[in-house]
Regions:
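Sec-dependent signal peptide recognition
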Residues: 2-9
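Secreted/periplasmic proteins
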Residues: 6, 17-106
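Elongated periplasmic alpha-helical coiled-coil
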Residues: 10-14
Length: 106
């Protein structure tokens, strides 16, 4: 196998299984210290996210305007996007009172 083929194969294996752009929203502070769908307790300023179908415990890389953060899925949401904890949104510079387009890969 030539070096070029080897590098191509290596790049394909290193690529994330799924990558897409979605709308991110931020959890309301009302949920702080309440049970989440995956068996934990939601911490508003912690690093976590909710998604409608990505399995609980999956670590998702979220990217926004050049910033990137690995966030565990700890809850479910009734949306076609991702809900970020305030702590995750703050680190990614997602507006705490709005929505933003983000990239996710897992």
């Amino acid at each position: 196998m030539g070096m070029r083929r080897f590098l191509l194969l290596l790049a394909m294996l290193a690529a994330p299984a799924q990558a897409r752009t979605v709308t991110a929203t931020v959890y309301d502070g009302w949920y702080h210290n309440r049970a989440d769908a995956c068996g934990g307790t939601y911490q508003h300023w912690g690093i976590s996210a909710a998604h409608p179908w990505i399995p609980c415990g999956t670590r998702v890389r979220v990217t926004h305007q050049g910033r990137s953060l690995v966030v565990p899925i700890t809850d479910r949401c009734d949306c076609n996007s991702i809900d970020l904890s305030a702590g995750a949104a703050y680190r990614l510079r997602v507006p705490l009172d709005g929505v933003a387009k983000v990239g996710i890969s897992y």
